[in-house]
């Protein structure tokens, strides 16, 4: 396999499923490029596909715009002045793919496959595994230090001065480290029974009263929830403590970081390059970023 499929610089690994994904992407590229290169009737699915593909491929436009595509969202987050506003903002951000603190979804109830269940799941950290925040060996410490500098550089690209960028980085690390300490490890997440805590909405409100769950569910657009599963209770309770005890300005910095981090690969070449330098090279071991059409 290794002789027939030498590892290219854009991959840190390449197995049979990677090959399937690569072949699938090539076929999709051909289909989309054909649609994007022709005139399409306004309002059709083809027109929408062409518009979003051509926009994503227009690096000159993205480089000119810089931080502009997410500037209004950064300002919206910065407008939060009270902890009571954080829950509704979390729900609001979910509509643009940003889920700070924890994630959520609707999926089959693992104890009753005929029913779907709203589920809360741990999240909120940007390094994937809790050990990156907590282990003290040389390799992990080096990654953590590079992550800190990466956060600073990204805030600088977003228009923050050096002092503000470093202050924001400290806030991000404080919050993410607290979430990491309470989170389940990858091994612990493999135990289905330990990651299933079905309860009524009223029970959730009593267990985690520091979050306005009615406002949150209404904000994300979910109605009629009477039962749900809290996959990992401890990190959700830790988030409750964070929201109610950490100064709002630190939480603003954290949520702004989640936005910048999530949007980085869709912004200008400077953001893309810095994002790849850390997540691609440092964290994943890749030597070269993928071409724009793959990203």
Please name every model-derived segment.
Residues 1-295:
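Zn2+-dependent metallopeptidase catalytic domains
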